[in-house]
């Protein structure tokens, strides 16, 4: 399994102690379809990761694609991650399509969110592992049937979620690392869900039962193992989420 650590310039020195496979989360799209970069060490290799925070309209997708290609060549990046979290805008689509074509021509890989699947044939779709219902294996099996294992990468999010019971809408509340530690300090009985491939426990609060799902090093490794059996060979971790368990996961 090829593991990339998604890392900001500030955190890169600590992440680089564990791997040279870094997705550099230092880029965003600026006015006039420009590529903006934060202060970044003169590192080489890894991936160029572009966020969609405060992105103005992409009026010249060809110019933006050319800028991305130049940066990939200059820093020897092997591919590009489109870290788009907002709903896909129409002006993104020509850029995504042209970037996919441009990177394919120079044998570089484009990783993109599921919302962009189909826009750039041959790109790799990033799937989130933090599911809270159903079967994790069946979730991946369905994706493999849709995209093919060679066109899937995992966004290995470290799940920390609280659900009040009953929870008809299935909407949980994210927990910070400190909040989860505080709840675990009360020594609840913790169980493993083979279906969800994560750990869970319950506790009472204000007359209701609360249900907590969470990942640790063991469950994250198990998710990667399942993915490998299905032919999926790439995964991403957000470095701040796994810094405390990096030695246990191993890369």
Task: List the model feature ranges, each with a label.
Residues 1-135:
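Chitinase-like catalytic core of GlcNAc-active glycosidases
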Residues 22, 82, 152-154, 227:
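Conserved, mostly hydrophobic/aromatic
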Residues 64-71, 95-99, 139-143, 171, ...:
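A general structural detector for well-ordered alpha-helical segments in enzyme core domains, enriched
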Residues 74-77, 102-110, 143-151, 222-234:
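A structural motif corresponding to the C-terminal end of an alpha-helix
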Residues 89, 119-120, 161-165, 243-246:
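Short catalytic/ligand-binding loop motif for oxyanion handling, primarily in non-cytosolic enzymes
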Residues 92, 99-108, 192-200, 204, ...:
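Short acidic, glycine/proline-enriched helix-loop-strand junctions
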Residues 151, 155-223:
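Glycan-binding loop/region signatures in secreted carbohydrate-active enzymes
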Residues 223-251:
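Acidic/aromatic/glycine-rich contiguous surface patches that form carbohydrate-binding/processing clefts
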């Amino acid at each position: 399994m090829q593991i990339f650590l998604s890392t900001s310039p500030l955190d890169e020195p600590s992440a680089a102690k564990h791997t040279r496979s870094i997705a550099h989360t230092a880029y965003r799209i600026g006015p006039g379809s420009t590529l903006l970069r934060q202060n970044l060490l003169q590192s080489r290799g890894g991936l160029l990761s572009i966020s969609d925070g405060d992105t103005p309209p992409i009026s010249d997708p060809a110019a933006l694609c050319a800028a991305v290609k130049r940066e990939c060549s200059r820093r020897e990046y092997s591919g590009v991650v489109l870290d788009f979290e907002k709903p896909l805008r129409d002006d993104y689509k020509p850029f995504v399509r042209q970037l996919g074509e441009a990177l394919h021509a120079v044998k570089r890989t484009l990783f993109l969110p599921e919302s962009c699947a189909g826009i750039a044939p041959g790109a790799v779709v990033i799937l989130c592992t933090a599911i809270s219902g159903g079967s994790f294996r069946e979730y991946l099996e369905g994706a493999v049937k849709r995209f093919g294992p060679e066109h899937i990468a995992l966004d290995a999010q470290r799940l920390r979620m609280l659900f009040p019971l009953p929870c008809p809408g299935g909407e949980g509340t994210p927990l910070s690392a400190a909040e989860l530690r505080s709840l675990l300090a009360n020594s609840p009985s913790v169980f493993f869900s083979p279906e969800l491939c994560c750990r869970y426990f319950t506790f009472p609060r204000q007359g209701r039962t609360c249900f907590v799902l969470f990942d640790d090093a063991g469950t994250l490794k198990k998710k990667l193992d399942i993915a490998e059996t299905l032919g999926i060979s790439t995964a991403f971790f957000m470095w701040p989420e796994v810094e405390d368990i990096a030695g246990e996961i191993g890369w």
